[in-house]
Amino acid sequence: ETEGGIETKPEDVYLTDGASPGIKLFLNLLISHHLHGVMIPIPQYPLYSAAISQFGGTQVNYYLSEENNWAIDMDSVEKSYKEAVDKGIMVKAFVVINPGNPTGQVMTLENMQKIIEFCYKHNLVLMADEVYQENIYGEVPFTPFRKALDTMSEEIKKGLILVTFFSVSKGFYGECGKRGGFFRMVNVGEFEKEQIYKLSSVNLCSNVVGQNCVELIVNRPKEGDESYPLFKQEK
């Protein structure tokens, strides 16, 4: 419900020790051959290139436009995808970091819709790293990809596989050492959910302190609560 006020089913949310374990879980799930590719932005957060290498996949770069405030250039994205396919690479997923890391840009809704259309057209899992959603300093507001998906056609809304990632390490809280986070799945099939459950079970469960932090952040003080004035001041 934190993602744009859209209803969330408990079975579609997994608590993790920060965002990184969830990201690595999905990359591990998607990559089973050296010709399995994952599209990642350049510049990027090094976790993605390292994890793709760790799991034996192929990194497929797409380049952000520095001249256009580090926006995603869809012509460049299509070119990168085509070049990868021509080399025999089976592209499985598309990673987007919004707000950007390390670039800091916030994507417009129009740009997000184009990415959603691209992923749907090419049957790619859209992995949206949204851990910096509360570190916004410009004029463009943050829109969750889950909310952007809701603006699309019924066919795309029901057909695109989307996974979003959240962490207590960022935002105004910045609790890096607590290791709390979660990922949320949209349109993931039952068979795939079974595999995700198995992979997640290997780690038993996320740590309790991190879980507590997630609960406090998603159920933060609301207007009218006794603690709200102090919360607003410190935020």
Task: Describe these PLM feature segments.
Residues 119-120, 160:
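Residue-level detector of transmembrane insertion/anchoring sites
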